[in-house]
From Swiss-Prot:
It comes from Methanobrevibacter smithii (strain ATCC 35061 / DSM 861 / OCM 144 / PS). This is Sugar fermentation stimulation protein homolog. CDD domains: SfsA-like_bacterial. GO terms for molecular function: DNA binding. Belongs to the SfsA family. PANTHER family: SUGAR FERMENTATION STIMULATION PROTEIN A (PTHR30545:SF2).
Length: 239
């Protein structure tokens, strides 16, 4: 389905936006609960996908916004799919070599975004999994002077995910937090100490505990989104 171009006007709450389409104000679902205040500014060009579902409260979903001449993806949940597909395609060198791949692995009372492992057979021919790797994906849209930062608003949930990864690592598993920069202008990554010192400090603690940090970016076009197969640098220090 083709995208519909519009002009962003207002965001009454986290979930909806008022967008002008062909001279008429339409209500669009915003699939990103972050503030995105540096992106969603009055007059910004946006791209929407219409829905054929008559039961939906909103006719459109906001997928992209144009910022600094670049197409930025606002579909935060799409980050998980982009990373998962890139793993299957062998585009992430740090995550190659696994024979078992799973989305949304249940761990205690939480779900980890991606689970990788290797399949082996026991002496009776029964399959079992070894080399477990748990991956939590975070989509990043905030850019400050070419530097991607996460989160753009305080996130208790994000800090909780990091603590879960620390526990998994301490239990002998491989654990990874994967930051996918969804804004093409981002060239490296730093946690947002100014907006969320708790998450930022927990990220430092996670790295010290052995949780791996991977940073990649993606190319956005209206024809599709693809991960750029090259890891980027990060700096966890408080500036």
């Amino acid at each position: 389905m083709d995208y519909v171009k519009g002009i962003f006007k207002n965001r009454p709450n986290r979930f909806i936006a008022e967008v002008e389409v062909d001279g008429k104000i339409e209500i669009a679902h915003v699939p990103n609960t972050g503030r995105c205040k540096e992106l969603l500014v009055d007059g910004a060009a946006v791209y929407l996908k219409p829905s054929d579902n008559p039961k939906r409260k909103t006719r459109f979903t906001l997928h992209f916004v144009v910022n600094k001449g670049e197409l930025v993806s606002l579909y935060s949940q799409e980050a998980n799919s982009i990373v998962y597909d890139a793993i299957l395609d062998g585009k992430i060198k740090e995550l190659q070599g696994y024979s078992y791949h799973q989305r949304e692995k249940q761990v205690d009372d939480s779900r980890i975004d991606i689970y990788l492992a290797n399949q082996e057979d026991d002496c009776c021919g029964m399959e079992f999994l070894v080399d477990s790797c748990y991956i939590e994906v975070k989509g990043v849209t905030l850019i400050v002077d070419g530097e991607a930062r996460f989160p753009d608003a305080p996130t208790e949930r994000g800090a909780k995910h990091l603590k879960e990864l620390i526990k998994l690592k301490n239990d002998g598993n491989r654990a990874v937090v994967f930051f996918l920069i969804q804004h093409p202008a981002g060239n490296d990554f730093r946690p947002n100490w100014e907006n969320d010192p708790k998450f930022s400090q927990t990220l430092v603690e996670a790295e010290n505990a052995g949780v791996e940090i991977l940073v990649y970016k993606c190319n956005n076009t209206l024809e599709g989104i693809e991960l750029v197969p090259k890891s980027l640098d990060y700096d966890l220090s408080r500036k």
